Structures are given as C-alpha cells and as structure tokens.
Amino acid sequence: MRKFEDTYRHKGLRKKLVETVKQKGIQDEKVLDAINNIPRHFFLDSAFDEVAYEDRAFPILEKQTISQPYTVAYQSQLLDVKPFMKVLEIGTGSAYQASVLAELGVQVYTIERQKKLFEFNKKFDYLRKYPNIKFFYGDGYEGLPTFAPFDRVLITAAAPDVPMKLIQQMKTGGKMVIPMGSGDIQVMKRITKLENGELQTEVFDQFSFVPMLVGKND
C-alpha cells in the first residue's frame, strides 16, 4: 500500500511551482496559497513523484489527465469565488482542481462520468480532509438539478456549445468558466447570468482540454 509523505523537499518544489504560476500571471493570493498547500504528488502515481511539481499535465486513470497547475490556477482565479459559495464542477478527474476549490472555502459539487475514477476518488484518503467536497457519478451535461442553484459552475473539459442545462442551474449573477471550441485549441470564457436572464460573455486566453462527453462510462 502506498505511503503518502509530504517532505520538506516536496514543499520546496511546491513553492517553486507557485512562483512559476505567479510569473505566468496568476495574481490571486488565495489561489496561490491553495496551490502551495496541496501536495500534488499525492494525486499522481508514485512514478511521477520526481516531476509532480513541474507545470504540466500528467496521465491518470482511464486515459484522463491531471491538469497543468497553471490551468487549474487560471480557471480558479477566473471563477472568482468567495467562501461558502456553492460551486458545480464538471469533470472531477484527479480531484486536484476540486481540492483547490475546497481550499478556497467553497462547497464543491463535482461530477465524474468515468466510474473507475469516481470510485477511486471516493477511496482516496487524502480527500477526507475536505468534507466540503461532494462527489457524484453522472453525466456532466445534466448537472445536479437537485442541488441547484449554484453560485459558480466550472467546466474542466472542452465544450462545443454552452451547456444550457447548466446555465439553468446557475443563480442570477452566477458565473460559469468554460473552455469552448471543438478543435485542438479552445478559448476560455466566463459567462455571467444577468438579472434579465441574458448571458454576458467574456473571452480570455487559449488552452487545450479533452472534449466534454455526453453520458456516463461504466
């Protein structure tokens, strides 16, 4: 059984990672603190221990990836959360992004469509540190209407169009951060739901995400 240790060396590498992310333009100190607090190497196979704090994506279970820390920080900063907000995350993956959000003091409702990943995260001891994360197995396009409305929605996969069912589950004044596009490169957008029901869209930088898929995978 794997033994999880967060050594002084790991903490030193994490500080360097935070500096790298900061130099790339992340300014939100709370987001930087969250990256600094979370042992990213816990979320990866032990084979990646030496490189876990490089600013790049790595493979995890079910042909999925743990996102580049800069991307996680970028989306978290754009989401602009405040403590106790309800956040819907589509695509739990490694649960690293969910942990960053949990460090920011929000209530995270995260959906994973890959059953093996969902079950792995349910057994991942480190995540017990965050009682403010609730894990769900399901189709991200459907969201979680039972728990709506949400203050924020974070999509961690590329969507060709705005998922309107998720917009309906947002509060008035709520924000969605979503990488949009059907090619290899997507544009990060932030969509705000206005009082009159209209959507205000802000366009940001380009990224590369795996596509957001319909349905569940047993």
Q: Which sequence ranges carry the predicted segments?
A:
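Conserved nucleotide-cofactor-binding alpha/beta core module
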Residues: D80-Q200
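Class I SAM-dependent transferase core
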Residues: M1-L88, Y96-V100, L104, L117-F120, ...
